[in-house]
Amino acid sequence: MANLKYRILLIAALFAASVFALFPRTVVERVKREGVFVYDTVRRVPLKRGLDLQGGMHLTLEVDESKQTVADKSEALDRALKVVRQRIDEFGVAEPVVQKAGSERLIVELPGIDDAERAQDVVQKSAFLEFQITDKTQALEKVVPRFDEIAKTQGITVASGTAAAAGDSAKSTSVNSLLTQNADSAKDSTAAAGTTGADTTIKAPVVTGGLFSTNVQPGQMPGQYIVPESAFPAIERALQHPAILAAVPPGKVIRWGVDSLVSGAARFRALYVLDARPIITGEVLTDARPATDPVEGNVVQFTLNNEGARRFKTETGKHVRDNMAIVLDQRVVTAPTLNSAIGRNGQITLGGGTLQSAQDLALVLRAGALPVPLKVAEVRQIGASLGSDSISKGVMALGVALLLVLVIMVVYYRFSGVLAVIALVLYLVYTLAILAGFNAVVTLPGLAGFVLSIGMAVDNNVLIFERIREELDHGKSTRLAIDEGFRHALGAIIDTSAATILSGMVLYQYGTGPVRGFAVTLIAGLVAALFTTIFVTKTFFLVWLNRSRGTQTLSI
């Protein structure tokens, strides 16, 4: 009798804990309202819906070895995963999924995303920030003949150039605007630019004849050059050639500007020659925030840590009246003139960029740079209407399956079937609680796994009931028939459940996305099914026997 009470208490305690785990709770989420992210308090059921149930975007990312050779991909992806997860958390996506798939890929699932291109850019952007002084020694002019010679030898001409690379077709800016971008990037320590807004006349080529000497023209600040849009593909291709990279003057690097430039009907690109050693990098940033400057428009204000502020002030103090390029992912965003030393606080001007672009840049800077460049191996966009349709069909399938099971069990096994149905209800609650406890994401394949586990839970009861029937047919008492029925069916139940759980573990380990969702739900359902079949259903029989002492028959 005491043992029976403990059984009942355990079942009741687990049921109460499961209901508590599934009860809607108050959470604080970062949500977007009228284009601005704010923190809001909402109530949510702890079960997360996957992309196929609410729509969104699925990304598969892998290391881009064309940009950087990585010795240990798995370790690099572990570090990249932390950065991507932090970016997604700040992006304001509710219930995202960021996980590794094997040792070479990252899976990112963003439910409810309506701007897929923007989300992909935030996830994939390397966000490596550098502050570098522009060249004052005319180093490029000294090697232009050598560059021309190499380009001619390799057959690189304007006619042979290809279309501009993706990501280099940014917004257009007037040449006059770019060449007069000398306003300082720091609120607390710099003054206005030394140039004026007067019309700019592009100077004649440095030399004549070759690819570089014909198409590379000096700008109005040291280290800046202007390249016609028509020559950009060829120049970019040439600058990636190993021989030209080797001929770059020691201690210098060549970087393109972010914007495409306009002068009348002509379009140009800005090219910069910079000191290779950066003054500081984004590693010393402690904060970055979007803001609106009355002069510069939308900007990103940043704050440095103590070491970064000390180094920045010292280095910028050495380069007063020089130009300092702010370089993001090897593209020059702006190159203001330093009118005085800069301390802890500063800002990055975006040259007419939108508030949203300022928000995104601040977000990725706060999260930090990716340790390795990533490329998109696969992208899938799932509409919200498709997700809603999946929910209705999935719930319908689950409801029909449950109804048929309940009716068949009650009709075929009568009173024993009723006990099995009650145990099945507890099984459903336990399974959902397990999924909520492990923060599992419910997907359409997951619902299929749920239905399959229901079938296996019912099958376990069928095995037990048939064994009990056999024992009763052999003339054994009701109590003995129940005990023997459970004992003889136990081995088969454990064997089949264990084999299926192992299969689910293999699917989870080597599968991705939907396959993992199926595996998680299947495993959770089988664990709950084992408990309810072996322990809960047996307890119900014991309660019935205790209240019906002397009963010689069993409705089964």
UniProtKB/Swiss-Prot annotation:
Membrane disposition: Multi-pass membrane protein
GO biological process: intracellular protein transmembrane transport; protein targeting; protein transport by the Sec complex
Source organism, top-level taxon: Bacteria
Entry's transmembrane regions: 8-28, 391-411, 418-438, 445-465, 488-508, 517-537
UniProt keyword annotations, A-Z: Cell inner membrane, Cell membrane, Membrane, Protein transport, Translocation, Transmembrane, Transmembrane helix, Transport
Any one GO molecular function term: protein-transporting ATPase activity
Pfam family membership, one: SecDF_P1_head
This protein's record includes keyword Oxidoreductase: no
One Gene Ontology cellular component: plasma membrane
Compartment(s): Cell inner membrane
Main location: membrane
Alphabetical list of InterPro entries matching this protein: SecD, SecD/SecF_arch_bac, SecD/SecF_bac, SecD/SecF_CS, SecD_1st, SecD_SecF_C, SecD_SecF_C_bact, SecDF_P1_head
Protein's job: Part of the Sec protein translocase complex. Interacts with the SecYEG preprotein conducting channel. SecDF uses the proton motive force (PMF) to complete protein translocation after the ATP-dependent function of SecA.
UniProt similarity note: Belongs to the SecD/SecF family. SecD subfamily.
Subunit structure: Forms a complex with SecF. Part of the essential Sec protein translocation apparatus which comprises SecA, SecYEG and auxiliary proteins SecDF. Other proteins may also be involved.
Protein name: Protein translocase subunit SecD
Gene (UniProt): secD
